[in-house]
Amino acid sequence: MSERRGAARHPASLRPRQWACAALWAALCVGMSAARAQTDEIQVYDAEITAPGHFNLTWHNNFTPSGRTEPAFPGGIVPEHALNGVPEWAYGVTPWFEAGLYLPVYTRTGDGELLFDAAKLRALFVVPDAHDRRFFYGINFELSYNTPHWDPSRYTGEMRGIVGVHLGRFDLILNPNVDTDYNGVGQLEFVPAVRVAWNSGDKLALALEEYADFGPLEHFKPSEQQSHTLFAVIDYGTASRGVEFGIGRGLTPASDTWVLKLMLMQDL
């Protein structure tokens, strides 16, 4: 469903002022490291944003029916049988900039305990009219405030690149992401995602998505310690209202065995 974010309709490419805004956010997200823990958002970004002056709500929910039985760090959340998610509140500021707020990030543990996990701010910069272009691109920045059971670092961030092509009914999208906890450039965590989708008309899309965690850029983890999860995904809906559902299978010992994801999207 290539229009789930709502494409802006203003021709342009990213100009120097826009790149300056993106560079400012990048400066906030450099000089860091990350210990990968849980995630509230399992999604490949496609450079499409909410139209200027409009709001959009995306409700993320992820459930792990079979996964790791130990937390990623002492005091963390056990992934198996945990449900985590977040409402993502987005506002289209310009044809090339969307601001977002994730609040509240939450988890229902396998023991039935409901936890508040985090809050996040997001700044997404894209080439306008991504849906109408053969080649599209963008970059997203996130800053997070975390509780101790969600992440061992109080403040973390993400830089998410967006590069993709529309080839007829097919989409190929790469998100080369890095996660951070502001502790050194060499320790940036490389966590890319990729999506290959086939679009059947304007409302239905079938896709394969792969999410990975290779470890710090300065020294990747051994292959058996890396996380790799392959999702079969279906999208249905329009630019103003849609749903995405996926079933993920872990491919390595460090991955959760099965993960389900559900996203509900609605313009406000």
Predicted regions and their residues:
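N-terminal secretory signal peptides that target proteins for export/translocation
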Residues: 1-16
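Intrinsic structural disorder/low-complexity segments
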Residues: 12-13, 21, 41
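Glycine-centered signal
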Residues: 14, 34-37
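Hydrophobic alpha-helical segments, especially transmembrane helices
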Residues: 16-19, 123
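Bacterial N-terminal signal peptides
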Residues: 21-31
